[in-house]
C-alpha cells in the first residue's frame, strides 16, 4: 500500500505521485489542494 506523504486517501491507496488527498481521492492539481 502506497500513500502520499504517509497519508491514506480513502479508497485510493496509491497516492505516491499525487500532491494531496481531496474528498477521499488523490489529487494531482495543486489548485485542488487545501494549502
From Swiss-Prot:
Keyword Heme: no
Chain segments annotated as coiled-coil in the UniProt record: none
Disulfide linkage: 2-16, 9-21, 15-26, 20-33
GO molecular function terms attached to this record: ion channel regulator activity; toxin activity
UniProt KW keywords: Disulfide bond, Ion channel impairing toxin, Neurotoxin, Secreted, Toxin
Protein origin, superkingdom: Eukaryota
Cellular location(s): Secreted
Cellular component GO terms held in the UniProt record: extracellular region
Primary localization class, coarse: secreted
Keyword Lipoprotein set for record: no
Tissues with expression: Expressed by the venom duct.
Family per record: Belongs to the conotoxin I1 superfamily.
Entry comment, domain topic: The cysteine framework is XI (C-C-CC-CC-C-C).
Name assigned to this protein: Conotoxin M11.2
Amino acid at each position: 500500500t502506497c500513500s502520499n506523504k504517509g497519508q491514506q486517501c480513502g479508497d485510493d491507496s496509491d497516492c505516491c505521485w499525487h500532491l494531496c488527498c481531496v474528498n477521499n481521492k488523490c489529487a494531482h492539481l495543486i489548485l485542488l489542494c487545501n494549502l
